[in-house]
């Protein structure tokens, strides 16, 4: 990876992930080649928190159609990051 900011592409914000934030679990989209160690280091350095665990999931490509044209969405990887109890919360909704 080039830098720690390249490891975390974007936070995944859905109804389910918003409920997970109460348990101090946060979900990020990460590159397919990123490993758990890189993800942990990136979250700790960028947000200044301590990470307890990292789980990763490869989201498979899904078939899509647009009229007679068919194709697939891109495969991507998400990381579920659990923070320690004494870590501060990450503020994704600041200024909204």
Swiss-Prot record:
PROSITE patterns per UniProt: RIBOSOMAL_L23
Keywords: Ribonucleoprotein, Ribosomal protein, RNA-binding, rRNA-binding
Gene Ontology molecular function, alphabetical: rRNA binding; structural constituent of ribosome
Alphabetized InterPro entries for the sequence: Nucleotide-bd_a/b_plait_sf, Ribosomal_uL23-like, Ribosomal_uL23/eL15/eS24_sf, Ribosomal_uL23_CS
Superkingdom of origin: Bacteria
CC annotations in GO: ribonucleoprotein complex; ribosome
Pfam families cross-referenced by the UniProt entry: Ribosomal_L23
GO biological process: translation
Disulfide pattern: none
Function of the protein: One of the early assembly proteins it binds 23S rRNA. One of the proteins that surrounds the polypeptide exit tunnel on the outside of the ribosome. Forms the main docking site for trigger factor binding to the ribosome.
Family: Belongs to the universal ribosomal protein uL23 family.
PANTHER family the record matches: 60S RIBOSOMAL PROTEIN L23A
Quaternary state and interactors: Part of the 50S ribosomal subunit. Contacts protein L29, and trigger factor when it is bound to the ribosome.
Protein name, UniProt field: Large ribosomal subunit protein uL23
Name of the gene encoding the protein in the UniProt record: rplW
């Amino acid at each position: 990876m080039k830098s720690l900011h390249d490891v975390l592409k974007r936070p995944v914000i859905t109804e389910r992930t918003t409920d997970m934030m109460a348990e101090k679990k946060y979900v990020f989209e990460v590159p397919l080649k990123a490993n758990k160690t890189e993800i942990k280091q990136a979250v700790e350095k960028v947000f200044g928190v301590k990470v307890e665990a990292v789980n990763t999931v490869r989201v498979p490509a899904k078939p899509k159609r647009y009229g007679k044209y068919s194709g697939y969405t891109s495969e991507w990887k998400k990381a579920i990051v659990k923070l320690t109890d004494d870590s501060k919360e990450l503020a994704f909704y600041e200024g909204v």
